[in-house]
Amino acid sequence: MNNPFMQNMQQEEDRYLTDVHPLAKLWALRILVELGGAKEFINDNCFSHQWIAKHLGFSEALLGEQFNSQIAYQELAQLHQMAEIVQVQNPAQFSAELSYNLKLLQRLLGLNEVECLILGFVVLVHSEQLLDDIADHLGTLTAAKSMKALAIILAVPYEDVRQALAVQGCLHRSGLIHLQREYSSYL
């Protein structure tokens, strides 16, 4: 039985997610492929979040009645590979507004490029539902694992991320980002 309320909610969600930021999509694919988030995302019989699969670009066959987890993993690998190729050929950037604000903060606080990238990532996690939901597939992470995950997601050296998130770093001192080292948390 079709529930009109659920259909309206799905239509609203589809409308809201029609324009997923290219960086959010790339980073979501890295989480799924390079960090193992796919184990939670691709189940034996379906995707854990059908709407995410749709917006990442999975085929209609997998989104419908013909789901096959093996084919889903193959498509995921292809989607990830294509996103990486596109990123090399035509690098995605933050929106003009976010770029402007990051540049202002960079000048005011003396942030380096990696610190700006981490801050931009945090903004996208909080503003892009797709990226936020995919990041949850990593489960709880210690501070060290969070830094390793960020290095992989952002494709920057681990040591640069560690320095950017250090207690003596600009992000921590400014209060913009505080990585709690005492316990595990979601990314």
Where would I find each of the regions flagged by the language model?
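Intrinsically disordered, low-complexity N-terminal extensions of AAA+/P-loop NTPases
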Residues: 1-187
